Swiss-Prot record:
GO BP term (any one): translation
Membership in a protein family: Belongs to the universal ribosomal protein uS3 family.
Name of the protein described by the UniProt record: Small ribosomal subunit protein uS3
Keyword match Nucleotide-binding: no
Keywords: Ribonucleoprotein, Ribosomal protein, RNA-binding, rRNA-binding
NCBIfam families xref list: rpsC_bact
Length: 283
């Protein structure tokens, strides 16, 4: 189940929160939801070069507050705040209520799943090899503190006629653990051969619903829980201790008779140089 479901939707109300936070009755719900979809599509097109990771929309009483998380806040704000004012007026006209726009900076864009997916998509559109782009993104994420990352690309990779999927993983990515903080991102690369989809999962550690960090497992505890592993990462059987030569498998009970020793009967030797067996000597 954890392998197929959307990681963010699977963890809602546990460790993750909704991207649209407002309440509406039955008569206004469809209208407000449609406005949210239009706003997100507009921001995705308008701020295509601003490296926007996610957008949160809140609707207090007869107002709207939009928080934009970007690794390049200067591109969103513009020179002397001109671009942000144009953006506010466009969003106010679109939503029909006063809109307040907040800009939050993403400190580590190399560990943000959505930014990683967008970066790989841009590289594929520039005809960079998909394996090189994926492995470079994984190395940067692990170097900056991610505990695990998985990247999957699907489509006509390298222009082949039959579409296929390829994925790479480094570290741990526990998709079925609810307390695991999994960041998920999706991007599309529009190449001359067609659209290539990129999915990214980034594991940033465990987090409890209360916000308290969980108890860290030591290396010995993790080995006892998971068992020893081989060099290729697959589980293996526990090593068996070598039995000393001549030592019985189990200790005999006191006073018990010694175990009988099994002796294999030897076959009679074949006749050598025409010798006759002893049984046939008198015939």
């Amino acid at each position: 189940m954890g392998q197929k479901i959307h990681p963010t939707g699977f963890r809602l109300s546990v460790t993750r929160n909704w991207a649209s936070r407002w309440y509406a009755g039955n008569s206004n719900f469809a209208t407000m939801l449609n406005e949210d979809l239009k706003v997100r599509a507009y921001l995705k097109t308008k701020l295509k070069n601003a490296s926007v990771g996610r957008v949160i929309i809140e609707r207090p009483a007869k107002n709207a507050r939009i928080t934009i998380y970007s690794s390049r806040p200067g591109v969103v704000i513009g020179k002397k705040g001109e671009d942000i004012e144009v953006l506010k007026s466009a969003l106010t006209k679109m939503m029909g209520v006063p809109v307040h726009v907040n800009i939050e900076e993403i400190r580590k864009p190399e560990t943000d799943a959505q930014l990683i997916a967008d970066s790989i998509a841009q590289q594929l559109e520039k005809r960079i090899m998909f394996r090189r782009a994926m492995k470079r993104a994984m190395q940067n994420a692990m170097r900056l503190g991610a505990q695990g990352i998985k990247i999957m690309s699907s489509g006509r990779l390298n222009g082949i006629e039959i579409a296929r999927k390829e994925w790479y993983r480094e570290g741990r990515v526990p998709l079925h653990t609810l307390r695991a903080e999994i960041d998920y991102g999706f991007g599309e690369a529009e190449t001359t051969y067609g659209i290539i989809g990129i999915k990214v999962w980034v594991y940033k550690g465990d987090r409890l619903p209360s916000g308290e960090p969980p108890v860290d497992l030591t290396k010995e505890d993790d080995t006892k829980r998971r068992g020893p592993r081989r060099d290729d990462g697959k589980p293996s059987s526990r090593p068996r201790t070598a039995r000393p030569e001549g030592q019985p498998g189990a200790a005999a009970a006191p006073g018990a008779a010694p175990a009988a020793k099994r002796v294999r009967a030897k076959k009679p030797d074949a006749a050598v140089d025409g010798a006759v067996p002893a049984e046939k000597a008198g015939e």
